[in-house]
């Protein structure tokens, strides 16, 4: 059973990065198991390996989270059992990184087999290794996803223009320097080239090897851009992109980092590229055969001579393909017993994928009517797109004997077994230039909707049984009648330049053109033979030029046997060329044949792809950047004094659950952050703790506190209270003894006020006597005159001496108490002592802090000659409140 839990071999990725985003923190778990502190027990951790699959996905778990339930503590265990390191069986599961943390290209079967063969050679250059360090292979594979598609543009860096392959080599150089400190690993002995040149050659050669493993991908052009360049005056100038849609290189973080000589902070979006690779699973059809030829069943061959229906021998020079398959078994199966007269195209090859815009933009210019009928899918998963590019070898005069027939045999394979018993149909649309129309009628879009049947069956049959047996291949209808007319009209526009080139080649083959070949060595002769752009644009259109403007696409639809709903499965885009082509304004010849490739709606040159291809690191934004500035100590102390206004008592039913007050009261009287003049401020840590003072005027139904009925005048130092006896802010003890309790002391003035045992009350904080700064200027009607804190906790007044109020009678003060002070503060409070509450020595005069309860010093009172307060032997609880206080 232990073999079931062995980790799968996964190649390392991103080990070279200096960024913390590339670090797999699950690798930091150490092997081994902590022993028990005491051996008397038998407590073990619950691994639950029998309940959880050994290949579970760990993506959703954060690296710092515990993946197992902590074992319950028993007397024989210490606290370390709560943080036990996982068992070796769990360790294998931790070390197995999920697929989302590994480059998805490593999971492509062809490339994975190659990497398995090369894994043991990576460290040995002389034995076939490429980099001698596996980290450099990871850097190379990541650079394929990181580097943007550049098209014809270059990136200027260090005074040089860099293409995509050069940028990939620069990326590997940066990684190599970060790992080894130098680029000496790329040096080749007995070579005069620089390290940079050797590294670039190594990257270029390795790129050619790796590309072969991904040629069948639908997203190949997302990984490796096409090397076919758009040359002026060339036939291959159809794959063009809009330069305006490309992102600027200045905003690319990868190129910016390489220009600065550092490792980029971004990494490839593995999840996004995994979705692109997953497009392979949605392939439903593959091209299998494409043959276009002219044959006749009336031609008879006698003594290697072909005779038509009128028994007239055919010219061998006019029909060079007559004996093409006479002495071989490679003749087309569709040909049967017919005689081949001319073959336009037959071979079928596959090329790398491209974007659908390379086809549709050409139609938008050359065939706008066809472009209007095109309905592309919104996503690549909805419908398969592919292109068939047929290169036709035109007949010289296209005059065939009577009874000849043009055949276009196109066959595709159904790769999904679920679709092999479906009914299929094909919708064909075709447009051609006006020169290739045989009549002067309306030149619109040709449309044909026909079913796809087996051989011998057609739409004319009332009951078709083609879907009763599974079909692995289907025959796509080809518009042969339309193409017979197109090919017949195309020969009426001769290609003079290619005919002249053919004559020259014929002379060279006969030996008559040797003198002209010697003269071609001079610069003057070469300049005369080279094509001119002006003359090339002024030339008359040829049959090859007109055929290139023919646009056609076919939609393949399928329907399940028990359903009536048709689903579009694939769209085949057709592009036609001839063997007579142009390259840099010069006539060239290409062999006949058909190539096909996958197409995608998503464009690798678009901003969408270039933004989705990268994953940016998590920005380490400071707290001050997201919130208001951290409060100072004075602001914390002021918040502690204002705690009564920002909290409320929940009662004795749930004293341990703090209540978070609303940010703003319904009456807009005062909010949680309105204590500061600068607007919104960070709430203090004590904002949600219950207060040590009795609360006032709190509406438990709405959860708000209305404090507009109370005001404090900071200039006169008086409190104007229009509140009831228990609705205001009580700075003095209320009448009546505090309730008895066993463990927790209760704040005065509220019998249900919760208090935290063993923790100092926030009302006991003694702040520094400094002036309140501008940040704490009063902004509401509630404000305290200074920063003195009144300690109103439960006290033992048995040993407390009263204040000597007679010394205040002769002191003249400008401030006077309001008339409502006596009514509010009377009657006089009688403080009773409870011996069980506190020890009397706690409130002895020597231990009373001056900053909290003593009178201000002389320098704080403006050099007043008034002496300090004197203590009496006994406390007089009937001292009246005078206006001087």
Curated annotation (Swiss-Prot):
One of its GO terms (biological process) is conidium formation. Induction: Expression increases significantly during initiation of conidiation and remains elevated until colourisation is stabilized. Expression is positively regulated by BrlA. GO terms for molecular function: DNA-binding transcription factor activity, RNA polymerase II-specific; RNA polymerase II cis-regulatory region sequence-specific DNA binding. It comes from the Eukaryota. Residues 1-25, 502-539, 817-885 are annotated as: Disordered. Signal peptide: none annotated. It is found in: Nucleus. Residues 508-521, 831-840 have a biased composition (Basic and acidic residues). PROSITE patterns: TEA_2. GO terms for cellular component: nucleus; transcription regulator complex. Keywords: Activator, Conidiation, Nucleus, Sporulation, Transcription, Transcription regulation. Its main location: nucleus. InterPro entries: TEA/ATTS_dom (IPR000818), TEA/ATTS_sf (IPR038096), TEC1_TEAD_TF (IPR050937). Transmembrane segments: none annotated. Residues 124-217 bind DNA. The keyword Transcription regulation applies. BrlA, abaA and wetA are pivotal regulators of conidiophore development and conidium maturation. They act individually and together to regulate their own expression and that of numerous other sporulation-specific genes. BrlA, abaA and wetA act together to positively regulate the expression of the Pks1 gene cluster that mediates the biosynthesis of an anthraquinone derivative pigment that contributes to conidial pigmentation that provides protection from UV radiation, heat and cold stress. Belongs to the TEC1 family. This is Conidiophore development regulator abaA.
């Amino acid at each position: 059973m232990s073999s079931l839990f062995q980790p799968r071999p996964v190649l390392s990725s991103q080990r070279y990065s200096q960024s913390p985003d590339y670090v797999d923190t699950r690798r930091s778990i150490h092997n081994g198991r902590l022993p028990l502190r005491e051996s008397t027990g038998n407590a073990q951790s619950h691994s639950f390996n029998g309940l959880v699959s050994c290949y579970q996905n760990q993506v959703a778990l954060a690296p710092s989270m515990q993946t197992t339930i902590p074992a319950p503590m028993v007397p024989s265990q210490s606290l370390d059992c709560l943080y036990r390191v996982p068992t070796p069986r769990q360790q294998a599961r931790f070390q197995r990184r999920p697929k989302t943390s590994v480059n998805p290209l490593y999971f492509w079967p062809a490339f994975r087999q190659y990497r398995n063969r090369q894994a043991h050679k990576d460290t040995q250059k002389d034995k076939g290794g490429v980099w001698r360090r596996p980290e450099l292979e990871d850097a190379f594979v990541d650079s394929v996803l990181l580097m943007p598609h550049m098209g014809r543009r270059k990136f200027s860096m260090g005074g040089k223009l860099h293409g995509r392959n050069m940028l990939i080599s620069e990326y590997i150089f940066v990684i190599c320097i970060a790992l080894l400190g130098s680029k000496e690993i790329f040096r080749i002995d007995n070579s005069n080239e620089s390290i940079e040149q050797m590294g670039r050659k190594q990257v270029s050669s390795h790129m050619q090897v790796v590309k072969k493993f991904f040629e069948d991908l639908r997203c190949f052009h997302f990984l490796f851009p096409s090397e076919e360049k758009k040359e002026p005056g060339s036939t291959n100038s159809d794959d063009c992109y809009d330069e305006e849609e490309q992102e600027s290189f200045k905003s690319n973080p990868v190129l910016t980092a390489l220009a600065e000589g550092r490792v980029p902070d971004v990494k490839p979006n593995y999840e996004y590229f995994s979705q692109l690779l997953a497009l392979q699973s949605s392939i439903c059809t593959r091209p299998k055969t494409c043959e276009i030829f002219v044959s006749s069943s009336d031609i008879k061959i006698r003594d290697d001579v072909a005779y038509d229906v009128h028994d007239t021998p055919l010219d061998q020079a006019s029909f060079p393909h007559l004996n093409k398959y006479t002495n071989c078994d490679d003749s087309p199966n569709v040909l049967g017993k017919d005689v081949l007269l001319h073959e336009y195209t037959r071979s079928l090859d596959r090329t790398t994928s491209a974007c659908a815009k390379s086809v549709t933009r050409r139609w938008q210019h050359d065939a706008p009517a066809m472009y209007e009928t095109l309905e592309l899918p919104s996503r690549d998963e909805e419908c398969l797109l592919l292109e068939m590019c047929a290169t036709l070898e035109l007949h010289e005069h296209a005059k065939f004997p009577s009874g000849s027939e043009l055949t276009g045999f196109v066959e595709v394979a159904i790769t999904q077994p679920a679709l092999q018993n479906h009914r299929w149909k094909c919708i064909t649309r075709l447009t051609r230039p006006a020169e290739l129309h045989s009549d002067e009628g309306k030149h619109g879009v040709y449309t044909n909707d026909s079913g796809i049947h087996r051989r011998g069956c057609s739409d004319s049959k009332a009951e078709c049984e083609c879907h009763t047996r599974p079909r692995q291949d289907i025959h796509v209808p080809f518009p042969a009648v339309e193409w017979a007319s197109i090919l017949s009209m195309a020969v009426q526009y001769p290609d003079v330049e290619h005919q002249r080139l053919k004559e020259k080649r014929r002379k060279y083959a006969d030996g008559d053109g040797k003198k002209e070949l010697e003269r071609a060595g001079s610069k003057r002769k070469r300049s005369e033979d080279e094509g001119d752009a002006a003359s090339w644009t002024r030339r008359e259109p040829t049959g090859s030029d007109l055929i290139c403007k023919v646009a056609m696409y076919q939609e393949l639809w399928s329907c399940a046997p028990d359903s009536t709903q048709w689903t579009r499965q694939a769209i085949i885009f057709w592009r036609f060329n001839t063997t007579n082509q142009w390259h840099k304004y010069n006539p060239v010849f290409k062999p006949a044949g058909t190539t096909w490739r996958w197409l995608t709606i998503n464009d690798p040159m678009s901003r969408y792809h270039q933004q989705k291809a990268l994953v940016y690191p998590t920005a380490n934004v400071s707290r001050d950047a997201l919130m208001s500035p951290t409060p100072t100590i004075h602001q914390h102390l002021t918040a502690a004094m204002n705690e009564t206004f920002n909290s409320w008592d929940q009662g004795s039913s749930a004293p341990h659950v703090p209540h978070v007050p609303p940010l703003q009261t319904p009456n807009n009287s005062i909010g949680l952050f309105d204590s500061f003049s600068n607007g919104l401020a960070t709430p203090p840590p004590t904002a949600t703790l219950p207060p040590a003072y009795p609360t006032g005027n709190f509406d438990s139904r709405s959860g708000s506190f209305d404090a507009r009925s109370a005001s404090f005048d900071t200039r006169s130092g008086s409190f104007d209270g229009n509140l009831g006896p228990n609705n205001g802010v009580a700075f003095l003890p209320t009448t009546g003894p505090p309730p008895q309790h066993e463990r927790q002391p209760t704040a005065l003035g509220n019998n249900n006020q919760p208090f935290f045992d063993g923790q100092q009350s926030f009302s006991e904080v003694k702040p520094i006597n400094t002036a309140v700064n501008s940040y704490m200027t009063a902004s509401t009607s509630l404000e305290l005159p200074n920063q003195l804190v009144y300690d109103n906790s439960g006290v033992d007044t048995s040993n407390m001496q009263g204040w000597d109020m007679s010394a205040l009678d002769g002191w003249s003060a400008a401030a006077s108490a309001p008339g409502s002070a006596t009514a509010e503060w009377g009657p006089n409070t009688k403080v009773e002592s409870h011996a069980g509450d506190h020890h009397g020595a706690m409130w002895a005069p020597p231990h009373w802090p001056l900053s909290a309860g003593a009178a201000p010093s002389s320098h704080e009172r403006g050099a007043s000659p008034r002496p300090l307060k004197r203590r009496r032997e006994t406390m007089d609880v009937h001292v009246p409140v005078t206006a001087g206080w």
